[in-house]
A protein has these predicted regions:
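Bacterial N-terminal signal peptides that target proteins for export
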Residues: 1-9
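Conserved NAD+-utilizing ADP-ribose enzyme module
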Residues: 22-72, 97-98, 109-189
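Alpha-helical transmembrane segments
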Residues: 10-14
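Secreted/periplasmic proteins that engage bacterial cell-wall peptidoglycan
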Residues: 75-113
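C-terminal motif of bacterial Sec signal peptides marking the signal peptidase cleavage site
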Residues: 16-19
Length: 189
């Protein structure tokens, strides 16, 4: 083997080896798209104080729905780095619904019909008669985004909403609760 050929192979080897030495830069969290190509009425608000954006495709998928099905139109996943206060309007006759999945960062105001329309909440899903507040636990993941449209019983339809909602994957039946320090604030509105 000639000197030129050995030098060339050595340089190629060094170049390939050097390319493997540096780890790739961390990937930015994926920017979620609207489901089914639907146009969302709003955008995802910035991370709330006490949260950082994370990538969790399974949780995001659980919070999104196609048009007419409620849930979120688009969203981003966050992880609580400090307790974060959230509010929930629910049905008092169904006590198990107090620790549900859908919350708000802002204290809800009435009237109930306006709140229902702004958040695309079908009447058969909740009577919206009781208000509670809790804090999202440190380390818990949640999704934030604008509401998807909802087709309800009796031909009631709510359009997609720019109002950001908070999805916390609570499941009290399975013992999975990601909120704490809950207080029932009473009848609503």
């Amino acid at each position: 083997m000639g000197v030129t050929r050995v030098c060339a192979l050595t340089l190629v080897g060094i170049g390939l080896f050097a390319g493997c030495g540096a780890p790739p830069p961390p990937a930015a969290p994926a920017t979620p798209l609207a489901t089914s190509g639907a146009t969302c009425a709003g955008t995802v608000r910035t991370a709330p104080a006490g949260a950082r954006e994370v990538d969790d495709a399974a949780l995001l998928k659980a919070a999104l729905a196609d048009p007419g099905q409620g849930k979120l139109c688009t969203g981003k996943v966050f992880e609580a780095t400090a307790p974060i206060q959230v509010y929930r309007v629910w049905t008092a006759a169904k006590a198990t619904t107090e620790i549900g999945g859908w919350w708000s960062f802002d204290r809800p105001t009435g009237p109930a019909t306006k709140y229902r329309q702004a958040n695309a909440i079908c009447p058969e899903w909740s009577t919206l008669d009781t208000l509670s507040t809790c804090t999202i636990k440190v380390g818990a993941r949640f999704v934030v985004g604008p509401g998807q449209s909802a087709d309800c019983a009796d031909s009631v339809h709510y359009a997609a909403s720019p109002e950001n909602q908070v999805y916390v994957p609570n499941d009290t039946r399975a013992g999975k609760v990601y909120v704490e320090g809950c207080q029932k604030l009473g009848a609503w509105p």
